[in-house]
């Protein structure tokens, strides 16, 4: 009887341990897998900028003055005349009607009808422009080559130069609230503001990487991405940055350039880059997991209008939709 009791206890203990390990393995495994699908853009342009106002209405811009627009979540894209053949690098819309595109040679265009027509905006620079950000309908910034920062306080009617203190190309700008924001660029350049963009202060990144993009999950937690896999994190609004660059791995010859980063909430973030790479975090950047990508062409633009759907675009007119789902 004693031997039978011991046997039952041993089996029960083994089952408990097995269930414990099974539960641990399930908890440790990623819970969510994205569905990534190709969309037909009808264009061969290299697409560098993308913005979705909502899950139906979006725009993409790129080489040869290309502007594409969708009103049905990317099922169909139509080409819109931009009035220029300049390379367009970024697009931003304040609402469903008012928007801007920027690009090479100081190109700035604005639309008041949802991107159907575009008019010229004259600025005081011929430098290439790469980034757009507005903190209110009246107050916004453009950033670009040679340390260019342009500011508007009248809704984009007029743009004035601001001192950046650098000659490095500035590629991306983000405002986390009406007082704080960050700019990133070449040669490890990171600038921050704490006075509503009246002035910009250089921060030490301890890197010579070219940063292509910056995004914040909230007012203090942000990420910058760049060439050769550069991945940097701040937890204090941009004053200090920590190198979180992912290891290359045994079969890796060169770290992939990371070109765009977006966070849809405090936990969930996305990165796209060279060779169609898509990375995702569901734990605030503690881990980044590579998602299966249907393309090998570089992805250079990324937009998430909602936590449940996003789009990326890149070389050869590539556009993909990204829809999170359960594993």
Q: What are the residue ranges of the model-derived segments?
A:
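Bacterial N-terminal signal peptides
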Residues: 10-21
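Residue-level hotspots at or immediately adjacent to binding/recognition sites across diverse folds
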Residues: 23-327
């Amino acid at each position: 009887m004693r031997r039978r009791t011991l046997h039952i206890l041993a089996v029960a203990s083994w089952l408990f341990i097995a269930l414990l390990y099974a539960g641990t393995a399930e908890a440790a495994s990623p819970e969510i897998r994205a569905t990534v699908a190709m969309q037909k853009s009808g264009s061969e342009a290299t697409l560098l900028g993308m913005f979705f106002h909502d899950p139906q209405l979006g725009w993409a811009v790129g080489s040869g003055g290309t502007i594409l627009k969708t009103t049905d979540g990317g099922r169909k894209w139509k080409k819109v005349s931009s009035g220029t053949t300049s390379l367009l690098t970024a697009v931003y819309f304040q609402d469903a009607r008012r928007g801007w595109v920027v690009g090479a040679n100081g190109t700035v265009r604005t639309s008041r009808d949802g991107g159907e027509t575009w008019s010229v905006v004259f600025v005081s620079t011929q430098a290439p422009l790469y980034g757009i950000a507005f903190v209110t309908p009246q107050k916004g910034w453009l950033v670009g080559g040679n340390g260019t920062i342009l500011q508007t306080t009248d809704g984009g009617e007029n743009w004035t130069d601001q001192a950046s203190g650098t000659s490095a190309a500035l590629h991306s700008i983000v405002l986390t609230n009406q007082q704080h924001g960050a700019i990133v660029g070449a040669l490890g350049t990171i600038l921050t503001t704490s006075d509503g963009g009246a002035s910009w202060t250089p921060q030490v990144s301890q890197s010579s990487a070219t940063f292509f993009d910056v995004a914040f999950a909230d007012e203090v937690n942000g990420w910058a991405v760049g060439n050769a896999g550069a991945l940097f994190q701040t937890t204090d609004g941009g004053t200090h940055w920590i190198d979180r660059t992912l290891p290359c791995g045994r079969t890796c010859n060169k770290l992939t350039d990371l070109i765009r980063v977006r966070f849809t909430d405090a936990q969930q973030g996305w990165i796209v880059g060279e060779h169609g790479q898509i990375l995702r975090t569901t734990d605030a950047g503690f881990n980044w997991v590579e998602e299966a990508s249907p393309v090998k062409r570089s992805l250079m633009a990324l937009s998430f209008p909602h936590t449940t759907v996003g789009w990326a675009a890149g070389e050869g007119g590539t556009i993909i939709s990204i829809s999170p789902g359960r594993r």
